[in-house]
Amino acid sequence: SAASDVYKRQIYGNSGLGKTHLLLAIGQTIRHNNPSAKIAYVKGEEFVNQMVKSIGTGTAENFRQKYRNADLLLMDDIQFIAGKDSTQEEFFHTFNCLYEAGKQIVVTSDRPPKEMKRLDDRLCTRLEGGLLADVQPPDLETRTAIIRTKAAQFGMILSEDVVKYIAENITCLLYTSDAADDTPCV
């Protein structure tokens, strides 16, 4: 139903636009509002590796429960599971389990589901059935404001010419995703 589709979200866009930062902020907000919430965060590549390891060590059920018992599942860079059939199958069932229980699922990727080559059709349909958020690079005015703000945070005084030059020549401002270390890496 449309009301329950808000439980499924995908944030997509090019690298360096803050998708991971948004994903972590969602997790922090849920944790702040509900300290007992079970939040599972995993990168797509880690999900693949953990699944393979759990099969090899006979702990697949523990792996499943780790994610299926979450109140909120955050998966960063879901595109890394595309083309990995058994991993996609596992994630599909995990997704369904959480969705049917009314739990929240938020994923990030570098492109929308339909553009992910070798993404299982069923999984693509599930992802497209929720809210899709396309993160775009900031415009010139926004980049200028970000540069001024960051310069001030670091105690730097930049002339308007320097701010303008940076804003016009760097269209994507990259920051580390670690909220504790918001150091620019432009």
Where are these regions (language model features)?
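Walker A/P-loop nucleotide-binding motif
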Residues: K8-L22
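Short glycine-rich substrate-engagement loop in P-loop NTPases that contacts/grips substrate
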Residues: A40-N69
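Short regulatory helix/loop adjacent to the ATP-binding pocket of P-loop NTPases
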Residues: P113-R126
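Conserved AAA+ ATPase "sensor/coupling" helix adjacent to the nucleotide-binding pocket
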Residues: G130, T144-I157
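Conserved AAA+ ATPase "SRH/arginine-finger" region at the nucleotide-binding site
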Residues: G130-E141
